[in-house]
Each structure stands twice: as structure tokens, then as C-alpha cells.
């Protein structure tokens, strides 16, 4: 039995230490999914916390029909989308702050920061159905099959939403292509 499978089994039986270790394995990835969907850190932390609370409550019913990661990404996606639905639209917040070291060229740092802000704004401006698919595929690296399982939508729908989302990003970021080397 793998370490993850052991942690899942023990967590399902109420072992809080095992669940804490399981959360440690997934917390960064769950936060990233939530952040890319919600567009800000506070909502992402709220969604991540909600994800792990819901997962803990539901873990005794997890039967392994899909990978644990697929299951937890589904919970995270739902939690993030629920936050978006409940809260009024908020202005986007910049991506992770760019660390500036003494050797960094200030012009490069400013350009990199601007590129990150534009990309973040472009992603958060996508309709939620397209944003989720773009985040899961292009940011988190999930396969089409995994996205189909997470979102419970047909593969053709995944492909069309991804295509529309990418096209929208291309249009929004077209002026950056020469500067970014794309």
C-alpha cells in the first residue's frame, strides 16, 4: 500500500495526524487551483480551507473510484466556484510578488511584474467555466481525462472550453507576444 493510500485509509478512520499529513501533500496544489479560479489570495485560502474541511467530512465515503487528487481537485474547484458565486466581483490582485534580489535588473523586474499582472488579469477575466479548464490544464497540468473526471463534463466540452479560453487569452495578451518572446 502506498503512503498516500495508507494516509487516506487512516484519515477515513478519523486519524487526525494522518489527515494532517495528507493535507500537507495537497495543500499547495489545492491553494493554487483555488487561487487561479478565485483571483485573490484571501478567497483562495478560504476555498482551500473549505476544501479540506469538506474532504475530511467526506473521506469515509471516498471509495477510490477516481484518484484521490482528482477527488480533492473537484472539491477545490467547487469550493472556489461557490466563493465566486457568493461574492460580488472584486478587482484582480497581482500574481505572486516577484522577489527582487540585488542582482536583478530593475527594468527586467518591472517587465516581469507587468507580464504577471496582465496574465493574472486575463485569466481572472475569463468566464468561470473557461477559467477553471484553463487553470486545471495549463497551470496545474492535468490531463484531459483528469479534467473530465474533476468537472464531470464530457471530453468535448473540456476541449471546447479550453480552446475558447486560450483564444480569449491570446486576444487579450496579443500585444505582449513580441515582448514576452511568444
Question: What is each of the regions a protein language model found here?
Answer:
Residues 1-5, 89-115, 143:
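Internal acidic/polar
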Residues 57-64, 74-94, 112, 175:
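Arg/Lys-rich amphipathic alpha helix in sigma70-family domain 2
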Amino acid at each position: 500500500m502506498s503512503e498516500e493510500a495508507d494516509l487516506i485509509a487512516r484519515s477515513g478512520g478519523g486519524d487526525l495526524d494522518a489527515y494532517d499529513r495528507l493535507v500537507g501533500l495537497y495543500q499547495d496544489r489545492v491553494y493554487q487551483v483555488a487561487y487561479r479560479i478565485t483571483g485573490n489570495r484571501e478567497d483562495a485560502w478560504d476555498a482551500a480551507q473549505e476544501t479540506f474541511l469538506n474532504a475530511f467530512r467526506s473521506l469515509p465515503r471516498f471509495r477510490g473510484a477516481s484518484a484521490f487528487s482528482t477527488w480533492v481537485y473537484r472539491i477545490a474547484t467547487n469550493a472556489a466556484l461557490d466563493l465566486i458565486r457568493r461574492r460580488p466581483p472584486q478587482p484582480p490582485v497581482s500574481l505572486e510578488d516577484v522577489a527582487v534580489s540585488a542582482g536583478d535588473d530593475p527594468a527586467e523586474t518591472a517587465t516581469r511584474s507587468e507580464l504577471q499582472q496582465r496574465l493574472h488579469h486575463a485569466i481572472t477575466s475569463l468566464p468561470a467555466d473557461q477559467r477553471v479548464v484553463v487553470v486545471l490544464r495549463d497551470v496545474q497540468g492535468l490531463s484531459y481525462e483528469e479534467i473530465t473526471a474533476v468537472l464531470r463534463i464530457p471530453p468535448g466540452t473540456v476541449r471546447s472550453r479550453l480552446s475558447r479560453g486560450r483564444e480569449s487569452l491570446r486576444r487579450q495578451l496579443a500585444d505582449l507576444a513580441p515582448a514576452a518572446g511568444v
